[in-house]
Amino acid sequence: MVDDYTAKMTELIELMRLIGNDTQQCEVKECKRKISSTITDTLSAFSNGSGGWIILGLSEKNGFTPVEGFDARAMQEALSQACEKMTPVVRPVIVTCPFEGANLVFARIDEMLPRDKPCFTTALGPHG
């Protein structure tokens, strides 16, 4: 049985494979050895916009295929830590989902309430 998160992630990957790139609602990051340096930009954009999905461990340049050697557990923790570096703190749903023999990290970032915006990287400030 496939859970709802795995089904949604698979649906998004199939769409991105068809169109050849990630979308305004879904950002893909390889993150083989460490979390992407632009992850806080993505968290901010989705939190201040209309929300979105993040998939870690997937290679856009290799046709949206799983990254060999990706450590889902470590990257799930790194993503959680990145969320803590935001003001206000981003509280996504983060799950590990199976896909084509690998585990990927899948996160849903909700739009923040108007009173909580702007969401920004704490160290950079609201105009960073």
Residue ranges and their predicted role:
Residues 1-128:
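Conserved N-terminal catalytic/coupling substructures associated with nucleotide/phosphate chemistry
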